[in-house]
Amino acid sequence: MNAYNSITPETIQEDMRYLQLLSHSFPTIADASTEIINLEAILNLPKGTEHFLADLHGEYEAFQHVLRNASGAIKRKVNEIFGNTLRENEKKELCTLIYYPEQKLDLVKAVETDLDDWYVITLNQLVRVCQNVSSKYTRSKVRKSLPKEFSYIIQELLHENSMVPNKQAYINVIISTIISTRRADDFIIALCNLIQRLTIDTLHVLGDIFDRGPAPHRIMDILCDYHNFDVQWGNHDILWMGAAAGNDCCMANVLRLAMRYGNLAALEDGYGINLLPLATFAMETYADDPCTLFGPKVEKEDCTYNAKTLRMIGQMHKAISVIQFKLEAEIIRRRPDFEMDDRMLLHRIDFERKTITMPNGKEYELKDSFLPTVNPADPYKLTDEEREIMNKLHRSFVSSEKLKKHIRCLFRYGCMYTVSNSNLLFHASIPLNADGTLKDVSIAGKMYKGKALLEKVGHLIRTAFFAEEDNEDRPFAVDYVWYLWCGKDSPAFDKDKMATFERYFLKEKELHKEVKGHYYSLRNEEKVCDMLLDEFGVIGTHRHIINGHVPVKTIQGENPIKANGKMMVIDGGFSKAYHSETGIAGYTLVYHSRGFQLVQHEPFTSMQKAIEEGQDIKSSTQIVEMSTQRMMVKDTDKGRELVTQINDLKKLLMAYRTGLIKEKSI
């Protein structure tokens, strides 16, 4: 018995108000019937391809290349389409053109002797690639992706079969007219961008867009204009969101990390943060201090900074680190429920002995005891200069329009977790007890765990940024955003402590250790993953948890696929700082209609070499899970929405046919 036969005049009575509204969009039986036919057709198309990336860490060049080449998918399609009919070098040239059309066109025009002939060949090739990547979508969806100025022409080229007699002549006329009207360059660029767009239907970014790398702001520029994406916030994203919300501790941490990795461009050029007051103060305060422990971590071949600038960054790094320790103490004192007293360490320093007595009762020698702005009598009090610097930095952060735009984008398209097509996506952790049960976490005197914890945390982050200054909930929310960065029960962190002070000032490696929460070991167990999937209401025969946050040590043989395929960890080390640790330069998890594939990337050289020499990211593909039957739109979340729409339209048809609602004249 089909769904329509089960609909009767009696069963639709309670839906009449909604059906009356629906009738305005579909005023006749013909309109409603046509929409049902269209939606049923969509249900039987293959699902769109989803790409999952994590822990981009400001590596703009590698990120944009992975988007442009669709993690190697475009190269595979070019090989499938042209096979042995093109030389390897010709296929490489075509791929480079698709990835970087504007730049490649400039190079071609500088060397090509018969440009019109090149245009004819290239346009025909691009049309074939475009036909291939658009074949799994409805014409309506493809049409919505087209640039307006070329929409009609591209549709004609995509939907005409050159194998049919007389059609090739028609296509040839279109192409020759494009060339003769001097629109070939613009048309090629439009086709290449369309190929990129259609190859990735949905992009999921599992957090940590910020930190370490030189250009998180440029990644955000791409994402804010991207056609279909979502973000699951990572700890570094939350840190920047806290800075934009006015949390001085978050600002100090953002600045410290920028100095640590010598990445000032995002702050100064990207967001217009004025670092001059900090630089002036640091150079005066530490004029005779080499600040050896605070030299930025930059690669030897990096010529961005000279020795003088590197020393200045080291001085700024030390200055902001001390300010950070003082600011954090203010929150720890103000929020005893955070239980972070062990992170207040400045008062434990014996400046005469140049030692510190740690919370474990043992005394340790300091690697650096020159802290002229720390008053032993009141070690956590900011000096007048430090307070003035933070006031200026505070104004810089909260008044940056570019930063506001990017953070609003993160709020609009992001959250702590996402459930998508039987996959549970979150960046780091769900706090667990040792026995694998959900851990109760106290927030403002109330207990939260699992899904409720992530939703509460998400609400607090939004309150910190969006609430008015006089909102009584805002001060706690602003403080809690910092806790999410480094607190032991934070689902974005989930370690016993963040040993920042110890890593700078103490040589004992055992004090640097940050003990991970139980989640990170228990997620290897299938039953724990199933419990978490149930907690978040994830349904489906093949359901998974997808995480980032912890780099997968591929070089040591670690497998990113865990818990009998239920858990996928896709932090493969986009950040250059992690390449030696992971042995690779990032993962892309690809979920298409045939199943899951994990694409493992080797380091990206540079955009310049990609354009000039056709150097692509070398990627290897591991099949994770393949379906015996192709997954269609009807098997996805979107498909379930469409089925609901179809059922509503069938109810509207019944209302029309039984006279409960009158058809409207047009």
UniProtKB/Swiss-Prot annotation:
Pathway per the UniProt entry: Carbohydrate biosynthesis; gluconeogenesis
Cofactor: Mn(2+)
Classification lineage: Bacteria, Pseudomonadati, Bacteroidota, Bacteroidia, Bacteroidales
Protein name: Fructose-1,6-bisphosphatase class 3
Annotated EC: 3.1.3.11
One GO process term, biological-process aspect: gluconeogenesis
A single MF term (Gene Ontology): fructose 1,6-bisphosphate 1-phosphatase activity
Protein's UniProt keywords contain Zinc-finger: no
Positions of transmembrane segments: none
Annotated organism of origin: Phocaeicola vulgatus (strain ATCC 8482 / DSM 1447 / JCM 5826 / CCUG 4940 / NBRC 14291 / NCTC 11154)
Record InterPro entries: FBPtase_class3, Metallo-depent_PP-like
Enzymatic reactions: beta-D-fructose 1,6-bisphosphate + H2O = beta-D-fructose 6-phosphate + phosphate
Enzyme class, UniProt record, top EC level: hydrolase
Pfam families for the chain: FBPase_2 (PF06874)
Keywords on record: Carbohydrate metabolism, Hydrolase, Manganese
Stated family: Belongs to the FBPase class 3 family.
